[in-house]
Amino acid sequence: MHFLSTSTHSHINEIKIMTYELSPGLTQVLAFCRKAMQEKALSDISTDCLLLGLLHDERSQAMQMLQSLSCPIEELKQQIMARLDSLQKSPLPSSEALVLSMESRRLLRLTLLEARRYGEEMANELHLLLAILHDSN
């Protein structure tokens, strides 16, 4: 899977193409993020988009983990949607690649580190959830 990373400015200053080893579930999360980015006319995929992508599939390991911890999933989804709706709209990138914010790019790197930490060759949704949780502290 290829990703475009941008600077924190509204226009693309720097483009780097990276390849990550991702599970099918994590690939689906990122596909959902791309769709959400396009629907909401966002300039890039933010951490909020990544978290919303994790919350999209109720059968995912990340969702099962959050549900077992009695996390208020629907309330969390509504808060994230409200934050995304409040963001300034931008022209959509012409590429089919994912355009990641610097923060999201860093989170995906942390996701890979989480996978390696647990001896996994492929990063999955749980690794992304762990990366988000570790990063929020």
Question: Which role does the model predict for each range below?
Answer:
Residues 2-137:
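Histone-fold recognition with a strong bias for associated Lys/Arg-rich disordered tails
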